[in-house]
């Protein structure tokens, strides 16, 4: 959620930043609603003070009868009625909060202006995209190996699901262990095994609700299936005050994730690129406003390191204002090279959310010996999605005979296996 005080004091700049996100100016409407809310709040405080004064006088009166006592009692009753009326008005006047809840984060000054992904800015690239001239797509390779099943899986679950078998299932498990090991041992992330079912309040805190309600699955008793472990991880610090010396707090988790893919009809209908259910290693950092810029580079480097160790060609793109996620103030997308598609595809998103999520979930920190609190900054990164990493390995490590060479760094995780070949049932 955005800072209403900042909006109040920077109305022109606020509208300018909204325009970069292709949203109409809203400062005038927000300022009007804010004035109304503050006026009601001020009246409530005045009546509460008057009630306190009169109630104290009533309590100190020797005689609990007589005209003066009864008049004061009537005054207190009248104040209570007015307070109830004003508090009800305040509760019913949700327009300001509803408006603020639908507004995305303000872009950082370093974020380039742009309409869509075509205007993102190249930051750096790694690896040789021409090292393998073979160009079969992952679903062709996986199906031919008899280790990737879409047809039978569709009978079980419908479209956008896959079953991995044999050595591809083993590769999935190897990648999970490899990624978590790198993040915990080399980058000092603390491993978490979080819940996959969360309340709406947790989704709201992470910026998933109310705007993206249709993009998640909801159970019959009202729980949401997490679209990313970011939801569970950032909420670890919800409604807490953290001692400054404990920051940064870095978390890593592998979870299954679930997305309805609403609005993705017709996109990536074949293969493993866009599934309803997929595994992902997620990184989350909690830090101070002063350190969040450096932490953004740190968490992005952690994601890049996985691709470097796997020797997969990739590039890092700074997203423009029109392509950033809702809660992010600045985002790097890491795109891996896929020979089968002859293009780069997103494999990781690394975002600095500033205090946007922290304001929603009341996550703060304070210096030792101080009572003053400050909102933390939250950051997240994919580190990485397992399915898309398998896609990249299949396409970049394919051989003429249809077999797949195991990247050197994964051989021990695969029990010494160096090549994936056709499985015969």
From Swiss-Prot:
<dbReference type="GO" id="GO:0004828">
    <property type="term" value="F:serine-tRNA ligase activity"/>
</dbReference>
<keyword id="KW-0963">Cytoplasm</keyword>
<dbReference type="GO" id="GO:0006434">
    <property type="term" value="P:seryl-tRNA aminoacylation"/>
</dbReference>
<dbReference type="InterPro" id="IPR042103">
    <property type="entry name" value="SerRS_1_N_sf"/>
</dbReference>
<dbReference type="InterPro" id="IPR033729">
    <property type="entry name" value="SerRS_core"/>
</dbReference>
<dbReference type="InterPro" id="IPR010978">
    <property type="entry name" value="tRNA-bd_arm"/>
</dbReference>
<dbReference type="InterPro" id="IPR002317">
    <property type="entry name" value="Ser-tRNA-ligase_type_1"/>
</dbReference>
<keyword id="KW-0436">Ligase</keyword>
<comment type="subunit">
    <text>Homodimer. The tRNA molecule binds across the dimer.</text>
</comment>
<dbReference type="InterPro" id="IPR006195">
    <property type="entry name" value="aa-tRNA-synth_II"/>
</dbReference>
<keyword id="KW-0030">Aminoacyl-tRNA synthetase</keyword>
<feature type="binding site">
    <location>
        <begin position="259"/>
        <end position="261"/>
    </location>
    <ligand>
        <name>ATP</name>
    </ligand>
</feature>
<feature type="binding site">
    <location>
        <begin position="228"/>
        <end position="230"/>
    </location>
    <ligand>
        <name>L-serine</name>
    </ligand>
</feature>
<dbReference type="Pfam" id="PF02403">
    <property type="entry name" value="Seryl_tRNA_N"/>
</dbReference>
<dbReference type="GO" id="GO:0005524">
    <property type="term" value="F:ATP binding"/>
</dbReference>
<dbReference type="InterPro" id="IPR015866">
    <property type="entry name" value="Ser-tRNA-synth_1_N"/>
</dbReference>
<feature type="binding site">
    <location>
        <position position="382"/>
    </location>
    <ligand>
        <name>L-serine</name>
    </ligand>
</feature>
<comment type="function">
    <text>Catalyzes the attachment of serine to tRNA(Ser). Is also able to aminoacylate tRNA(Sec) with serine, to form the misacylated tRNA L-seryl-tRNA(Sec), which will be further converted into selenocysteinyl-tRNA(Sec).</text>
</comment>
<comment type="pathway">
    <text>Aminoacyl-tRNA biosynthesis; selenocysteinyl-tRNA(Sec) biosynthesis; L-seryl-tRNA(Sec) from L-serine and tRNA(Sec): step 1/1.</text>
</comment>
<dbReference type="InterPro" id="IPR002314">
    <property type="entry name" value="aa-tRNA-synt_IIb"/>
</dbReference>
<keyword id="KW-0547">Nucleotide-binding</keyword>
<feature type="binding site">
    <location>
        <position position="282"/>
    </location>
    <ligand>
        <name>L-serine</name>
    </ligand>
</feature>
<dbReference type="GO" id="GO:0016260">
    <property type="term" value="P:selenocysteine biosynthetic process"/>
</dbReference>
<dbReference type="InterPro" id="IPR045864">
    <property type="entry name" value="aa-tRNA-synth_II/BPL/LPL"/>
</dbReference>
<dbReference type="GO" id="GO:0005737">
    <property type="term" value="C:cytoplasm"/>
</dbReference>
<protein>
    <recommendedName>
        <fullName>Serine--tRNA ligase</fullName>
        <ecNumber>6.1.1.11</ecNumber>
    </recommendedName>
</protein>
<comment type="similarity">
    <text>Belongs to the class-II aminoacyl-tRNA synthetase family. Type-1 seryl-tRNA synthetase subfamily.</text>
</comment>
<dbReference type="Pfam" id="PF00587">
    <property type="entry name" value="tRNA-synt_2b"/>
</dbReference>
<feature type="binding site">
    <location>
        <begin position="346"/>
        <end position="349"/>
    </location>
    <ligand>
        <name>ATP</name>
    </ligand>
</feature>
<keyword id="KW-0067">ATP-binding</keyword>
<keyword id="KW-0648">Protein biosynthesis</keyword>
